[in-house]
């Protein structure tokens, strides 16, 4: 039974149309729906449209959509839940009367609304008559945002959420701790943000330049601010997964609490980039106590099923020399320092499991052995993910070769006036070539739970550059993670972006990269 209606004031309408008379679909959607057919006469885009909702929850969802739409003119909508559909599945029927969107849950309805938004931007005074049936290939469609190498405000994190959410991304992996800055407030460990959140200066130019700006850089997120981000994302059907690095990338934390390092002194918040020997002491009982304190508070803020525990780029040179670490190895019968990392990971996983949570870690966590319940995020190519899937572990594919969006976007960045980046060359077309199932048989493919694009910010000091590096490459992540085997050919995909997304990028003022569209 319909119990609520939303009356909306509207300001303006935009762009192209679909010819229903010919029953030909001439609108584009990214990612491309599983089924889209032209039918009926369509729905007028009204100055004062109505959103007819089946429940109060859908009424709130409709109000959020109006906010995200940003004041453009809209057609009438009818929103409902269809329990026969899968959670993120939706149908859209705009043959007459209203744009009727049914989802298997609020998430399904939301993705239907995002599809409708792209179509509205291609319409003039009528939303075309269409029948759409659609659902994602993968349940995890992620975007990682590093807010440690450079700090970004809460408002900018919200802008990031809206930007990737437009592409049906449903996970924000929030990278919160690093050598160059600790960002989350932990009330029981106040020095983490009092000391660890600020570095005295930042490298200028590429790694090895030995030139610094002489300006302190830092910032942190209060617990209330982080809860605000969680709520903001949830209203847009996104989950926020926090990352707390362990045992490496520890310089900022050890500057605040040096007694937790193997050396016990001499630490500082790093001012340059790279991998550092500073590491939490595996043989110090205080290390696990520290992480448990941190995670107690993190779990109160973030309700996500998963907590990311890092695990990448953890040099073991200090463990090799540390009497406490060597004593622990002898006690446990270990033959490799890699097992010390597994000791930390497995203890933390058990602790989080007791709280009803699961862990994700970068693929290095495989090196000393992991439990079957750990999810592996494969970043050093796909080999780690393939190995994990063959072992029966769940996997998120996030390879540098396809989805490290801090890489340059053209082969000649200087000639193309690209902003300074870490290196490499990752154009949109290369992203689009990724096959998440390559090297796996049908049974092993079931362990690939999703795909993620990562944005590391060593060379991204401004939010405008964040947009430039994400757009339009995040659309490739969206198309593969949503459509996968049914994705369109690359030229069609680019044309779809031009029709369906560029008008929205332009209207929102996004600083998108133009290279893929230059003829």
Where are each of the predicted segments found?
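Flexible loop/turn segments at secondary-structure boundaries
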Residues: 151-153, 179-185, 247-253, 308, ...
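Feature activates predominantly on carbohydrate-active enzymes
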Residues: 23, 85-278, 282-306, 347, ...
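Bacterial Sec-dependent N-terminal signal peptides
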Residues: 1-27
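Active-site neighborhood of glycoside hydrolase catalytic domains
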Residues: 253-259, 268-374, 379-390
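Active-site-proximal beta-strand/loop segments in catalytic clefts of secreted hydrolases
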Residues: 54, 103, 176, 243-245, ...
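Soluble non-cytosolic domains of exported or imported proteins
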Residues: 56-59, 107-110, 151-155, 220-224, ...
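Acidic, contiguous N-terminal accessory segments
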Residues: 20-136, 141, 353-366, 370, ...
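Flexible, acidic glycine-rich loops studded with aromatic residues
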Residues: 358-364, 369-374, 380-519
């Amino acid at each position: 039974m319909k119990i609520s209606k939303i009356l909306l004031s509207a300001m303006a309408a935009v762009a192209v149309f679909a010819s229903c008379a010919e029953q030909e679909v001439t609108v584009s959607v990214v990612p491309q729906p599983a089924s889209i057919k032209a039918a009926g006469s369509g729905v007028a885009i009204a100055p004062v449209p109505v959103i007819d909702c089946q429940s109060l929850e859908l009424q709130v969802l409709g109000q959020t959509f109006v906010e995200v739409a940003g004041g453009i003119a809209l057609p009438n909508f009818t929103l409902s839940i269809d329990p026969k559909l899968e959670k993120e599945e939706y149908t859209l029927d705009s043959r007459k009367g209203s744009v009727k969107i049914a989802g298997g849950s609020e998430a399904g309805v939301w993705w239907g609304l995002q599809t409708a938004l792209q179509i509205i931007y291609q319409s003039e005074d009528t939303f075309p008559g269409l029948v759409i049936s659609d659902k994602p290939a993968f349940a995890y469609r992620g975007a990682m945002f590093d807010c440690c190498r450079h700090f970004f405000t809460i408002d900018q994190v919200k802008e990031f959420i809206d930007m990737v959410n437009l592409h049906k991304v449903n996970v924000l992996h929030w990278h919160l701790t690093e050598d160059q800055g600790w960002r989350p407030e932990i009330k029981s460990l106040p020095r983490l943000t009092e000391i660890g959140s600020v570095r005295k200066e930042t490298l200028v130019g590429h790694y090895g330049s030995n030139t610094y700006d002489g300006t302190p850089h830092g910032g942190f997120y209060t617990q209330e601010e982080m809860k605000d981000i969680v709520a903001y994302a949830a209203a847009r059907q996104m989950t926020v997964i926090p990352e707390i690095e362990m045992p490496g990338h520890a310089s900022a934390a050890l500057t605040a609490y040096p007694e937790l390092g193997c050396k016990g002194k001499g630490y500082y918040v790093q001012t340059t980039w790279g991998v550092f020997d500073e590491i939490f002491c595996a043989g110090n009982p205080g290390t696990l106590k520290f992480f448990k304190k941190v995670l107690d508070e993190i779990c109160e803020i973030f309700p996500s099923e998963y907590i990311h525990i890092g695990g990448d780029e953890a040099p073991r040179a200090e463990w090799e020399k540390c009497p406490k670490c060597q004593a622990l190895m002898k006690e446990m019968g270990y033959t490799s320092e890699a097992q010390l990392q597994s000791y930390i990971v497995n203890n933390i996983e058990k602790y989080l499991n007791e709280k009803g949570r699961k862990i994700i870690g970068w693929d290095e966590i495989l090196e000393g052995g992991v439990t079957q319940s750990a999810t592996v995020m494969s970043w050093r190519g796909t080999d780690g993910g393939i190995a994990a899937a063959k072992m029966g572990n769940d996997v998120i594919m996030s390879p540098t070769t396809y989805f490290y969006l801090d890489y340059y976007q053209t082969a000649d960045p200087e000639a193309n006036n690209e902003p300074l980046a870490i290196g490499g060359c990752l154009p949109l077309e290369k992203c689009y070539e990724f096959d998440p199932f390559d090297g796996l048989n049908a049974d092993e493919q079931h362990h690939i739970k999703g795909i993620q694009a990562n944005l590391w910010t060593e060379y991204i000091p401004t939010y405008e550059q964040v947009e430039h590096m994400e757009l339009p490459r995040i659309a490739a992540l969206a198309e593969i993670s949503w459509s996968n085997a049914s994705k369109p050919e690359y030229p069609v995909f680019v044309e779809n972006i031009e029709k369906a997304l560029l008008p929205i990028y332009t209207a929102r003022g996004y600083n998108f990269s133009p290279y893929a569209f230059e003829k």
